[in-house]
UniProtKB/Swiss-Prot annotation:
Gene3D superfamilies: Rhodanese-like domain. The gene is trhO. Keywords: Oxidoreductase, tRNA processing. It comes from the Bacteria. The active site is at C191. Residues 133-231 form the Rhodanese domain. This is tRNA uridine(34) hydroxylase.
Length: 319
């Protein structure tokens, strides 16, 4: 039985998807309108980014609604193979639905990078362990540092970036010298759902790197296809929604979100004396003024009042 089938007891299905495909402005506006109307009618929530290079998004709703949404999106894009990963949860993972037109669906900040024309070689989830253990390979985690800290593949390089825009500078300063000294190394990259590492491979190819690979479907596809017994994944996978993190079974993990700084906080962080619910965590204890914390405290008070009036399990725990 597939992991996805065993989780159908949960009310909500989450779809994380992307597709690098050329879209003209008129089509972007049409797609945005169609998807917004569909999301409203089907009570789907989430975030969709549309740009001339494609579409990127994560949505949450009932299974039938999600199936209809993905089918509609594929029809609008005139494709039949959009890259999509599924997971389940007992509560709505988003507060609202947003569809936005952007310059890029994942921002690297370089106009000349075009993943619709050139990307690296895909590595299937079932073949990823072999690549990780290959002494002639170097593996790079293209996610942000705060994501990597809560879960990663051991031995992967951490560029220690706070945004994807910083990745090219890291490549020039660190990766390029490494490959110049070790030209036979194969390069493998991974990210949450496949989009960042796919665009990263496009950048490396543009910069003249060869033998560039990336994990198809990202960490989410790996966790879906590879059993925990055979897995080389450590920790939890950060996701950009109310669940904050997922465990190896693709269920909501143990992390929460600090409402002050927006970083994930672990159960251990919640026990630290620096942690104050809604006001600060250990990572941001020195980042805000008393005026900021007064605003945070009022916001937390309002959140607590709202939660008292809502049915149990209708909203994620506040931190």
């Amino acid at each position: 039985m597939k992991k996805d089938d065993s989780l159908k007891k949960f009310k909500y299905k989450v779809a994380a998807f992307y597709n690098f495909i050329s879209i003209i402005d008129e089509e972007i506006l049409l797609i945005k309108e169609e998807l917004t109307n569909l999301a409203t009618n089907q009570k789907i929530k989430g975030t969709i980014l549309l740009a001339s290079e494609g579409v990127n998004g994560t949505i949450c709703g009932t299974e039938n609604a999600i199936v209809l949404f993905i089918e509609t999106l594929e029809n609008l894009l005139k494709v039949s193979d959009i890259n999509v990963k599924y997971s389940w949860c007992e509560r709505q993972a988003f507060r609202r639905f947003k569809a936005r037109k952007k310059k890029e669906i994942v921002t690297i900040g370089l106009k000349e990078i075009n993943p619709t024309k050139s990307v690296g070689k895909y590595i299937k989830a079932g073949e990823w362990n072999q690549f990780l253990e290959d002494p002639d390979s170097v593996v790079i985690d293209t996610r942000n540092d705060y994501e990597i800290k809560i879960g990663n593949f051991a031995g992967a390089l951490n560029p220690q970036t706070s945004s994807f825009r910083e990745f090219p500078a890291w490549v020039q300063k660190h990766l390029k010298p490494l490959i110049e000294e070790n030209p036979s190394l194969k390069i493998g990259m991974y990210c949450t759902g496949g989009i960042r590492c796919e665009k990263a491979t496009s950048y490396l190819i543009e910069e003249g790197f060869s033998d560039v690979h990336h994990l198809e479907g990202g960490i989410l596809k790996y966790l879906e296809d590879v059993s925990s017994e055979n897995s080389l994944w450590n920790g939890e996978c950060f996701v950009f929604d109310q669940r904050v993190s997922l465990d190896h079974e693709l269920l909501p993990g143990s992390h929460r979100m600090c409402h002050a700084c927006g970083l994930p906080i672990s159960p251990e962080d919640l026990k630290k004396p620096t942690y104050i619910k809604g006001l600060q965590c250990d990572a941001c204890v020195n980042k805000f003024t008393d005026s900021d914390r007064a605003r945070f405290a009022e916001r937390q008070r309002q959140i607590d009042e709202i939660m008292k009036r809502l049915p149990e399990n209708s909203i994620w725990p506040s931190s």
